[in-house]
């Protein structure tokens, strides 16, 4: 009887010796798996980008750090998108104003942008628009008024800082191919004071 009790005590002591190591190994295994999952996500679904310049101010500023998603992406009006601009030879960030088939009218005299006959909000804009060279001069209706129809497979984008943005109004950018869109901005990670999810709106 005493011998069995001693054996049981020895087994318990042995468990106490091995349990901490097992716990550490389990934790390391879980941590390694979590890192692997994060790597997969940032390889195939998400990526981080840094804003260069002030073309999207006052909503995004130079050096802001953002997370974009490129999983199952179909650009929609109001989305903040990161895309390749072969005219500017760089990656740019802009707001999607129109998608294929949309009719866009920009009136610098009234400081308005219309999409399919509806004036979009300008509450998020930095200042009143100033007239500037546009993508398709043949669509000029009158001084300061321009109209566009977005072709199939393309989008029309503009910076929130209308007077400090090279975008679809410019001959250097023009309409953007949907396939050149790298991702939609979904989250801001820096500055920490503005950390949070990014909503789509126009």
Give the predicted meaning of each segment.
Residues 2-25, 58-202:
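Soluble "head" domains of membrane/secretory-pathway proteins
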Residues 40-57:
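Aromatic-capped interface at the extracytoplasmic side
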Residues 29-45:
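Hydrophobic membrane-insertion alpha-helices, especially the h-region
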């Amino acid at each position: 009887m005493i011998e069995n009790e001693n054996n049981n005590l020895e087994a318990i002591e042995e468990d106490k010796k091995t349990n901490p190591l097992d716990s550490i190994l389990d934790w390391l295994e879980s941590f390694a798996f979590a890192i692997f999952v994060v790597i997969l996500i940032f390889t195939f679904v998400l990526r981080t980008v840094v804003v260069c310049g002030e073309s999207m101010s006052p909503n995004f500023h130079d050096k802001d750090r953002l997370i974009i998603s490129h999983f199952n992406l179909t650009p929609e009006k109001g989305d903040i998108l990161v895309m390749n601009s072969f005219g500017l030879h760089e990656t740019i960030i802009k707001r999607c104003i129109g998608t294929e088939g949309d009719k866009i009218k920009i009136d610098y005299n009234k400081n308005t942008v219309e999409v399919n006959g509806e004036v979009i909000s300008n509450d998020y804009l930095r200042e009143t628009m100033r007239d500037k060279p546009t993508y398709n001069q043949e669509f000029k209706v009158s001084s300061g008024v321009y109209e566009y129809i977005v072709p199939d497979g393309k989008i029309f984008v503009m910076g929130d800082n209308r007077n400090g943005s090279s975008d679809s109004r410019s001959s250097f950018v023009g309409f953007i191919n949907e396939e050149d869109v790298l991702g939609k901005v979904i989250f801001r990670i820096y500055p920490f004071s503005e950390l949070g999810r990014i909503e789509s709106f126009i």
